[in-house]
Structure formats: C-alpha cells, structure tokens
Amino acid sequence: YGVDVFVVDSLLKCGIADDDYSGQKAFVEALCDFKNQFGVTIFLVTHSRKGDNEFQRTGKMDVRGAGAISDLCDTLLTIFRNKKKEAEKSRAQAMHEDMPPDLKNAPDAILYCDKQRNGSWELQATLWWHDGANQYTQNELQEAEIYSQMRVVGQ
C-alpha cells in the first residue's frame, strides 16, 4: 500500500507484561526484522521509568522495560517537557504576574537524540508549544501550521 512509516503507540499496549523482558526483546526483534525486510521506518513509543521528579530529563538508560529496547533500536529519541515552566506559567497566570525571564525564554520542550546508529548526530532540538495548532515549532516566533480543523462536539 506504499506505507513506509509505522508508529506503535505504545509498547505498553502491545499485550506484553511489564516484567516480561524476554517478550519485550522478542517483540522489538520482530519489529527490527520487519523494518529490514520491507525497508520501512518504525517508531516505537515507550515510557520512561519513574525518576526522582518530573523536572529532570530522562535518557536511553531510563527506558522502561527490557534493556534490549534501547540496545536494538537504530535511533533513540527522548522528549523532555519543561514541566517547571508549565507550572510557573499556570501559577503566574493565576496570580496575574509575569513569569521569571529565565523560564519565560526557556523552551517548552527539548527533543534529544540519545542514540544514532546511522551517523554521529546525537544532539538536541529546542521546541516551543503552540496551543492553537496543538504542535511544537522550532522557535517561539515560528508560525505553526494548521493541518486540519477539528470540530469539538458540544461547542
């Protein structure tokens, strides 16, 4: 059918128990075999292990589940939402105050490339959230593209 990108969201919904590490490894190996056989790209969404708090970023060592998940993948991306900024923005709006400049100018999220088997690029990209379009852009001044208009039932 010409489909060359697949998104599996998420590993937790694939019927494999949290503690079934060999089952998780077998599933990821099957995805790798499928990718190699058909020349496609597969994004497998996983979750991070719980950390000390939600204000610290996670990396490839924090992928929840079998270590084989991060070992077998070609590229590992993690996204860090700036929850400290989100909390301060909510507080400042409720109190009708300005946000501290360091948080106001900080990105809303950072996309990290923690593993890259197809080259040496393991950097990061800063992202800014646009409520109206429900998407991130590369800087806070960039206009977000609206790809479709959704009608909310009941409004």
Protein language model annotation of sequence segments:
Residues L11, H47-S48, R81-N82:
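Short, ordered loop/turn segments at secondary-structure junctions
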Residues Y1-F6, A30-G39, G51-Q155:
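C-terminal regions of RecA-like/P-loop NTPase motor modules
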Residues Y1-A17:
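Conserved P-loop NTPase "ATPase switch" module shared by AAA+ and STAND
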Residues V7-D9, V40-H47:
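Structural recognition of the conserved hydrophobic beta-strand(s) that form the central parallel beta-sheet
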Residues C14-K25, D52-M61:
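Flexible beta-alpha connector loops of hexameric P-loop NTPases
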